[in-house]
From Swiss-Prot:
Electron transport recorded as keyword: no
PROSITE patterns: PUA (PS50890)
Segments forming domain PUA: 2-81
Catalytic activity: cytidine(1962) in 23S rRNA + S-adenosyl-L-methionine = 5-methylcytidine(1962) in 23S rRNA + S-adenosyl-L-homocysteine + H(+)
Organism: Shigella boydii serotype 18 (strain CDC 3083-94 / BS512)
SMART domains for this protein: PUA (SM00359)
NCBIfam families associated with the record: PRK15128.1 (NF011707)
MF terms in GO: RNA binding; rRNA (cytosine) methyltransferase activity
Entry similarity comment: Belongs to the methyltransferase superfamily. RlmI family.
Lineage: Bacteria, Pseudomonadati, Pseudomonadota, Gammaproteobacteria, Enterobacterales
Gene: rlmI
Main localization of the protein described in the UniProt heading: cytoplasm
Keyword Isomerase belongs to the record: no
EC numbers: 2.1.1.191
Location within or outside the cell: Cytoplasm
Name used for this protein in its record: Ribosomal RNA large subunit methyltransferase I
């Protein structure tokens, strides 16, 4: 008999709506014993089968659902089916947009909770973020090797969230050849260098692909400030869009060095690109005090909020930084501002920008809205999958 997680009476509603998480507060008891990440059956208080998922005793998310089909086993064949299903959409997208790199698996939205897989050319970069994903590592890797024999697999499960589920961080080659220090990829006509082994996340922010492209429509003959620039994707896109100057700001000199290489790789005018190592909050205040002005500002900060207790502080941070940006824009200037914090809703983010505009003493029009690129889908039953949101704002 399988191990069963029994829900308290009336706590099955989210599973009946096919939400993939079971929170600890909904659980009545366990029947049997399961190890960290092991597959268990989830039943209601009367014993009716609801789902099959991965058990995580140390997490507030006590189980993550693999399947709502009682006949489906969690094995190599299961992962092969999920991968093939996800690949169909990415194949179409890659052909339409001329991509050689994309998110192959977007966790829960692709039916594989806690699993992120990005493809960069012939390298698959793996992040296993949950106990269940780690427990199924061997089956997943086996499925990947069969479906993608041409690809090397590199593990970037070096993320702090693993510690919340009692797991160590892991990093290194799984199969195949080691990725080069900087791997060139192509995106909307740009060549960009990706540091798979040591870069942020899996090496590059694929989710901002379409936002980088959208930037080009606003920048012709404009002076652009690119905040939290990382390796310069927005800067390269701005130069391709015909900007007169782009200033990229980041705290990492290594990232700025790669940004410079990316400009050179695309044979763009390096004299129009400036790279500044500094704290963005501090530099924006310095620019304001000096009377500096820009026509377009890209504001793409890292995640400010990890949990609900940090949300109010994050709101203040987002408001302050957007207020400073609005103050630096010429009349008719464009602010492209983003939040990658999952707990920050689009409505709340829009209100924060409106409040920032009031504090800056400027009127702002919302003219365009952004979200993560189409290879980062959001399944309808898991709205939490929509984590990246952004706005193009015209400052009056």
């Amino acid at each position: 008999m399988s191990v069963r997680l029994v829900l308290a009476k009336g706590r099955e509603k989210s599973l009946l709506r096919r939400h993939p998480w079971v929170f600890s507060g909904t659980v009545a008891r366990m029947e049997g014993k399961a190890s960290l990440g092991e597959t268990i059956d989830i039943v209601d208080h009367q014993g009716k089968w609801l789902a099959r998922g991965a058990y995580s005793p140390a997490s507030q998310i006590r189980a993550r659902v693999w399947t709502f089909d009682p006949s489906e086993s969690i094995d190599i064949a299961f992962f092969s089916r999920r991968l093939q299903q996800a690949q169909k959409w990415r194949d179409w997208l890659a052909q339409k947009d001329g991509l050689d790199s994309y998110r192959l698996i977007a966790g829960e939205s692709d039916g594989l909770p806690g699993i992120t897989i990005d493809r960069f050319g012939n390298f698959l970069v793996l992040q296993l973020l949950s106990a269940g994903a780690e427990y199924q590592r061997a089956a997943l890797v086996s499925a990947l090797q069969t479906l993608y024999p041409e690809c090397a697999i590199y593990d970037r499960s070096d993320v702090a969230v693993r510690k919340k589920e009692g797991m160590e961080l892991t990093l290194g080659l799984v199969t195949g050849e080691l990725p080069p220090a900087l791997l060139p990829i192509e995106e909307h006509g740009m060549k960009l260098l990706v540091d798979i082994q040591h870069g942020h996340k899996t090496g590059y922010y694929l989710d901002q692909r379409d936002s980088r492209l959208a930037t080009r429509r606003y920048v012709e003959n404009k002076r652009v400030l690119n905040c939290f620039s990382y390796t310069g994707g927005f800067a390269v896109s701005a130069l391709m869009g015909g900007c007169s100057q782009v200033v990229s700001v980041d705290t990492s000199q290594e990232a700025l060095d790669i940004a410079r290489q990316n400009v050179e790789l695309n044979k763009l005018d390096l004299s129009k690109a400036e790279f500044v190592r500094d704290d963005v909050f501090k530099l924006l205040r310095t620019y304001r005090d000096r009377g500096e002005k820009f026509d377009v500002i890209v504001m793409d900060p890292p995640k400010f909020v990890e949990n609900k207790s940090q949300l109010m502080g994050a709101c203040r941070g987002y408001k302050d930084i957007n207020m400073l940006a609005i103050q630096l824009l010429n009349e008719g200037g464009i602010l492209l501002t983003f939040s990658c914090s999952g707990l920050m809703t689009s409505d709340l983010f829009q209100k924060i920008i409106a409040d920032a505009a009031i504090d800056a003493g400027r009127d702002v029009q919302f003219i365009e809205q952004f979200r993560q690129a189409a290879d980062h889908p959001v399944i309808a039953t898991y709205p939490e999958g929509l984590y990246l949101k952004g706005f193009a704002c015209r400052v009056m």
